C-alpha cells in the first residue's frame, strides 16, 4: 500500500508551486510505484507458490514417514502378538499337556498297553526278532509285567520290561535290526503338540 502521508505532501508541493514540470515527475513516480506494486505482487505470488510447494512436499514426506511408522508399528505389533502366542502356548498349553501326559504315563497299565500295541504293530508288519521293551524310569516294572501277561512277556528279551532313561512312555527295540520304536513322553508330547496346536490356537486366539 502507498504511503498516504508522502502522497499528501507531494500533492501539497505540486499545488503550491503549480509548476507543470513537476507533472512528469509525478507520473514517473506513479509508474515507479505501480511497477513496484506489480513486482511486489509477483514476488508475493511466487513466495506463496513456493511456500505451498514446500508445505505439500513436507506433508507428503510426513505422510510417507507416518505410513512407514504405521507399517513398522503394525509389524512390531504382529511380532509381539506372535511372541505372546508362543509364550502362552509354551506356558499354558505345552506345560499343561506335559503335566497331563506325565500323569497318564505314570500309570503302569498305560505303559503295558503301549508296549502291547507296539509289539502287535511290528507283528502285523511281519517283523520278528529279539525285542526289548523299556518303560519310564518312574514306573514300576513289576506292575507293568503283570498287566502285560505271560503271552506278551514271552515275546520280550529277558521275559519282562526294562527301565529306560526317559521319564514316561515306552520304547521297543528290535535288536536284530537296530530299530527303536519310540513312544517316550517327549516323543508323545511333540506328536500331541503338532496335532493339537492348531485347535488350541483357534480356541484361545480366535479373532486375534
Curated annotation (Swiss-Prot):
Produces ATP from ADP in the presence of a proton gradient across the membrane. GO terms for cellular component: proton-transporting two-sector ATPase complex, catalytic domain. One of its GO terms (biological process) is proton motive force-driven plasma membrane ATP synthesis. InterPro entries: ATPase_V1_Esu, T3SS_HrpE/ATPase_suE. This is V-type ATP synthase subunit E. GO terms for molecular function: ATP binding; proton-transporting ATP synthase activity, rotational mechanism; proton-transporting ATPase activity, rotational mechanism. Belongs to the V-ATPase E subunit family. It comes from Chlamydia caviae (strain ATCC VR-813 / DSM 19441 / 03DC25 / GPIC). Keywords: ATP synthesis, Hydrogen ion transport, Ion transport, Transport. It holds the Pfam family HrpE.
